[in-house]
Amino acid sequence: MDGESSLERYLDQCDAEDVLASSAHMYTPMTPYDDLAIQPLPGTSYSSALEQSKELSTDFSSVDLSFLPDDLNQENEDQQEQQTSSQSLEQDSGICLDASNLSQPFTPSECRDASQDSTNLCPMPITPMTPMTPMTPVAESSGIVPQLQNIVSTVNLACKLDLKKIALHARNAEYNPKRFAAVIMRIREPRTTALIFSSGKMVCTGAKSEEQSRLAARKYARVVQKLGFPAKFLDFKIQNMVGSCDVRFPIRLEGLVLTHQQFSSYEPELFPGLIYRMVKPRIVLLIFVSGKVVLTGAKERSEIYEAFENIYPILKGFKKTT
């Protein structure tokens, strides 16, 4: 009996301890796992184990990578070479890329400022489609003034003309309708020639200046008036001016046509001169080996002078050295 009673008391005591333990777990507030203190087992040190794990995580020099395929090792080496080359290239060019700036989006104002800066730094010129005369820097003026040799002008007499009557009664006039359908009339001062058509149109050639051309045309109109025709003097206009000059040195035309083949043509078997068609001003030049130059196609005297000043430094570059 005493043994049974002592056994029962022992069991009751154990049950009471279990109830207290369970109630303590139920009513105690929960704490985060980080606040729980780690109770090391006797005979072990966690600090040394943590330090050893850190060393293992950071140091891979002793790890054997022989089991990896060669392709992966080659790719890693290529990536490292690209990174080092890009870094060295940035250092050489003075460009530094900031990852924080790249991650931030640009604002519209910044984009607009960047576009304006780029247009200011790198303007794109609009080149014309038509060929332009090559511009050669003129170091000094040529000192040569082309002389006008011929001026062609036209005028309208504004009346119908009887060419046979004009040829019979006017001096220094000839008319051959089988050869040319106009009266050819000449005067001595200024020394010019006129072509008079039955429609009343007249062409005056041979004058050496603009004033001489106008004066000669008026004299021809006066002759026609004296023959009984109601001639007027309308729409006088200079159609062509011809000038010439000498640069006083021989020119290598073969080299000139090769360099400026877009503007020039040279066929010595057909014509001994090089034909150079200038775009601005619109003048045609005949250039000869001797250095003589003929300029034609101008409407004004200034175009003759401008064309020669443009072509002179080019001719100087192809001067023959004997």
Curated annotation (Swiss-Prot):
One BP term from GO: DNA-templated transcription initiation
PROSITE patterns: TFIID
An MF annotation (GO) of this entry: DNA-binding transcription factor activity
Keywords: Developmental protein, DNA-binding, Gastrulation, Nucleus, Transcription, Transcription regulation
One cellular component term from this protein's GO annotations in UniProt: nucleus
Localization of this protein: Nucleus
Name of a matching Pfam family: TBP
SUPFAM superfamilies: TATA-box binding protein-like
Matching InterPro entries: TBP, TBP_CS, TBP_dom_sf, TBP_eukaryotic
Protein role: TATA box-binding transcription factor. Members of the TBP family are differentially required to regulate transcription and development during early embryogenesis. Required for gastrulation. Regulates a large subset of genes that are ventrally expressed. Binds to a subset of promoters.
Family membership noted in the UniProt record: Belongs to the TBP family.
Protein's UniProt name: TATA box-binding protein-like 2
Species annotation: Xenopus tropicalis
Lineage: Eukaryota, Metazoa, Chordata, Craniata, Vertebrata
